[in-house]
Design a protein with these regions (language model features):
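Feature recognizes metal-dependent phosphohydrolase scaffolds
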Residues: 1-617
Length: 617
């Protein structure tokens, strides 16, 4: 059975890593133990929308997981207030200690008590991982010390207890306790979440997406499912001028000039001066917005005309401005539109566009962040039996997968998302095809785009006074994803047939205030729009949802709005979470039930074959 050429060659390669039967046995024992540990905790977030402070807090409290562990350990021994103090210390160790020091609350007894409490929390969180994995997570400067403290055991003569106390006493005496507390707090947060899923839209109206990406850049394990706002910035960084105009317009609309000018070095001065001169608007931001909006519709029109396969001809507006006066469009707001060539930039606009283009494609920090989005991101992800995507899988009015004509072929369902992923990556190479770069704009705003899924009415909202024309029809997906059979159809399309498979979806806010439920299709689909956008909190009634998937099952968490870091430090204010157990596994889920576990089982099988081979020698 194992003597064919393929297996013989494979076994020879395995032997290079395991030089004896004892090496093989040791690895089989190791992997067999690993696959029987509890599954690590997955944390799902979506629609961060550039809101850094709220995002930082939800990352620090791990969607309430830290508080749950602190309560589990200390509920019977320390007060509610002291538990909240400990949680805030874990969330913001440096800032909280500075405040406590000002209040005169820190002394050697406080250090000793706090260090012991933090070690207990770290011990609990590390218990589901191998010692090797925990060691890899330890901060290098304290790795040996923390490893000793986490694994100190009581013995008959209390030797280990004395050893433990002496380590902590020495740290305090050497005045290194602050840094040690910071290191322990970081370890606790790292152990609380094994893997992070960002289900789209790091960017949008919030002004600090750059800070969020800086934080994510160093995160230990994550994936990103691109959102429509992410792909817009990615398209801008690829050099798509329509995407560049959209990015600038969106940030001017929400007065987020800092992310453009300070974070990414995009100068708006020339655009502002042109807008003030051409549109007669004194306010620089409003003038720049007026100018970039007209440039946007010109450039979008060029793309629509060049790509009839986008099926977006109904979005061509500048060649019928006179007709649109009947619905309130003021022709005077388009001073640079030439009736003979309505979609052509004039000379001044073209000069401005070239300079903006150059800044977007050469800006080092923006390119670093976009490269990260490409490296960690994709159109969708199948992970541990769940299907993750931001927007939708486009369907027609009958619920059948809708077709889109790309590069000479029709694509639908999973093949469509795969093709979109391929095109997006092709746009971010040296000397890309113009068609691939053009497609980035379609992904942002195309009615049949899996990332958009609706007809954007940007023109109407900007210029039309009749608000009845502002409604943006959505893809039938959004009316059908309440149906279990429809969601199962999508899951099957992506190769998921297990009863425990789910769709994890972002993109659309859940209006809890109106009784809307984030759980759809009898539990087959979860909408986890994170609700970080402050402007939406009053409309939805909450600050969105996150999802936790640990060894005990799935838990959906609803959040209250975040106030501020200052409030959290002074008053121990947390983002309150209400947790609903959506699915409680009948048995605890182990590593062997995960994607990684299945690969390890395959490795164990191969090692058994190698062991048989050794024993036949």
């Amino acid at each position: 059975m194992y003597n064919d050429k393929g297996n013989t060659k494979y076994l020879k390669l395995l032997k290079q890593n395991y030089s004896s039967s004892q090496d093989v046995i040791r690895e089989i024992v190791n992997l067999s133990a690993i696959i029987n540990l509890p599954k690590g905790t997955e944390f799902f977030l979506s629609d961060i929308h550039g809101e850094y402070e709220a995002f930082l807090h939800i990352m620090n409290n791990c969607s309430g997981v830290i508080k749950e562990k602190v309560d589990l350990i200390f509920k019977e021994t320390i007060s509610d207030y002291d538990r909240q103090e400990l949680c805030t210390l874990i969330y913001y160790p440096r800032e909280k200690m500075a405040l406590l020091d000002e209040q005169g609350k820190i002394d050697s007894d406080w250090y000793a008590m706090t260090l012991n409490q933090l070690i207990l929390v770290a011990k609990l969180l590390s218990s589901k991982y191998t010692r090797s994995k925990v060691r890899k997570a330890l901060p290098k400067e304290y790795a040996y010390i923390i490893d000793e403290l986490l694994h100190a055991q009581e013995d008959e003569d209390a030797n280990q207890v004395r050893y433990h106390k002496q380590i902590l006493k020495t740290i305090i005496d050497l005045e290194d306790a602050d840094e040690f507390i910071i290191a322990l707090s970081a370890l606790i947060k790292r152990l609380a979440v094994d893997h992070l899923h960002i289900v789209g839209d790091v960017f949008d109206r919030g002004g600090s997406a750059d800070k969020i990406l800086d934080l994510l850049y160093d995160y230990h394990s994550l994936d990103i499912e691109w959102g429509n706002h992410d792909i817009l910035w990615m398209g801008a960084a690829c050099g798509n001028d329509a995407c560049i105009c959209n990015v600038i317009r969106n940030n001017l609309k929400y007065n987020n000039v800092e992310i453009l000018e300070n974070a990414y070095g995009i100068s708006l001065r020339q655009l502002m001066l042109f807008g003030m001169k051409t549109y007669g608007i004194e306010d620089g931001i409003e003038a720049a917005r007026a100018a970039i909006t007209v440039m946007l519709f010109k450039l979008e029109g060029q793309l629509i005309l060049a790509h009839p396969e986008y099926e977006m001809g109904n979005r061509l507006m500048l060649d019928r401005l006179d007709d649109l006066q009947d619905v309130g469009v003021d022709r005077k707001r388009f001073p640079t539109v030439d009736d003979e060539r309505p979609y052509a930039l004039n000379d001044e606009e073209a000069v401005i566009m070239r300079k903006l283009h150059r800044q977007f494609v050469t800006g080092q920090r923006l390119q670093k962040h976009v490269r990260f989005l490409y490296d960690k991101g994709s159109m969708y992800n199948v992970y541990n039996g769940n299907l993750l995507y931001h927007g939708c899988v486009p369907v027609d009015s009958n619920g059948a997968f809708d077709k889109l004509y790309i590069d000479g072929e029709f694509y639908h369902g999973r093949a469509l998302l795969d093709k979109c992923d391929e095109k997006a990556r092709a746009a971010y190479v040296d000397n890309p095809y113009k068609d691939d770069v053009d497609f980035m704009w379609f992904l942002w705003g195309g009615e049949k785009s899996p990332l958009c899924g609706r007809m954007l009415k940007t023109f109407e909202m900007e210029y039309v006074t009749d608000k009845s024309m502002w409604e943006e029809p959505s893809n039938p997906y959004y009316s059908r994803y309440y149906d279990k059979s429809f969601c199962c159809q999508i899951l099957h399309e992506f190769g998921l047939y297990d009863d425990d498979a789910h769709i994890i979806n972002g993109h659309t806010p859940v209006h809890a205030i109106e009784g809307e439920n984030p759980v759809r299709a009898n539990g087959k689909l979860f909408v986890i729009d994170g609700g970080f956008c402050r402007a939406m909190n009053k409309k939805t009634g909450i600050a969105g949802y996150t999802l936790i998937y640990n060894s005990h099952g799935l838990r959906l968490k609803a959040h209250t709005p975040f106030t501020s870091v200052e409030d959290a430090l002074i008053n121990n204010t947390d983002i309150e979470t209400s947790s609903e157990v959506e699915e409680n596994d009948k048995r605890r889920m182990l590593v062997k039930d995960t994607d990684i576990g299945k690969r390890l089982i395959g490795e164990i099988d191969d090692l058994h074959k190698l062991l048989e081979n050794y024993r036949r020698l």
